[in-house]
Amino acid sequence: MANEANPCPCDIGHKLEYGGMGHEVQVEHIKAYVTRSPVDAGKAVIVVQDIFGWQLPNTRYMADMIARNGYTTIVPDFFVGQEPWDPAGDWSTFPAWLKSRNARKVNREVDAVLRYLRQQCHAQKIGIVGFCWGGVVVHQVMTAYPDIRAGVSVYGIIRDSEDVYNLKNPTLFIFAENDTVIPLEQVSTLTQKLKEHCIVNYQVKTFSGQTHGFVHRKREDCSPADKPYIEEARRNLIEWLNKYV
């Protein structure tokens, strides 16, 4: 993802070689990757892609990790058939590319996914998790959908306007200290404004020494020094879902 005022490169990081536990389905007008929980507890989590798309193995790995913790997970194609960002692409064209993939205009897709989860997966309790571009989607959804019980926004760009602080349900925000995409000043502003305006539970957590994408685009076995932070962030994500979904 990139700063809204000045879009800039987002490194794809370590792309995992991962096949996945789930399968692809058609959900009304969009495709999606679905993984059923080994235990059907009536709980589901929507997992929202970053700019590299719904088929990125890293995102599917995260969805499967969540599924192993008792949730049916779904990774919808929120780009609705449009191409994801190509890591080898010309970054000068990124602002135009991003404009046609507005993370705050996804209600039609969210509504379709909610219908699918309730009708086909018998989900009664639903949460949402998103990374980078998907973190913005989570923030938007948590201000608009009171029936989504919990959200985790992982390094999503922050827009400073009154409506983004009116969260409907508990939301966890995860950031990286050395994120060149999201300045710490933005994180501080978010923290202060939530303190002033938000009436539901929330947490803003910044991980020391980490960079943009560390939770889902770093291989912990290749970065031993980062492994504790990656594991802690993933554990926090699951704990938040367990507590509020």
UniProtKB/Swiss-Prot annotation:
EC top class, as a word: hydrolase
Q: Which Gene Ontology cellular component terms are annotated?
A: cytosol
Gene Ontology MF terms: hydrolase activity
Q: Which residues carry this modification: Phosphoserine?
A: 223
InterPro entries named among the record's database cross-references: AB_hydrolase_fold (IPR029058), CMBL (IPR042946), Dienelactn_hydro (IPR002925)
Q: Which residues form the active site?
A: 132, 179, 212
**Localization of this protein:** Cytoplasm, Cytosol
Domain of life, per UniProt, equals Eukaryota
Q: Keyword check for Electron transport, yes or no.
A: no
* Keyword Cell membrane tagged: no
Q: What is its EC number?
A: 3.1.-.-
What SUPFAM superfamilies does the annotation carry? Answer: alpha/beta-Hydrolases
Keywords annotated in UniProt: Acetylation, Cytoplasm, Hydrolase, Phosphoprotein
Pfam families attached to this UniProt entry: DLH
Q: N-acetylalanine-modified residues are where?
A: 2
The family annotation for this protein states:
Belongs to the dienelactone hydrolase family.
- Describe the function of this protein: Cysteine hydrolase.
The identity of this protein, by name, is Carboxymethylenebutenolidase homolog
Name the gene.
Answer: Cmbl
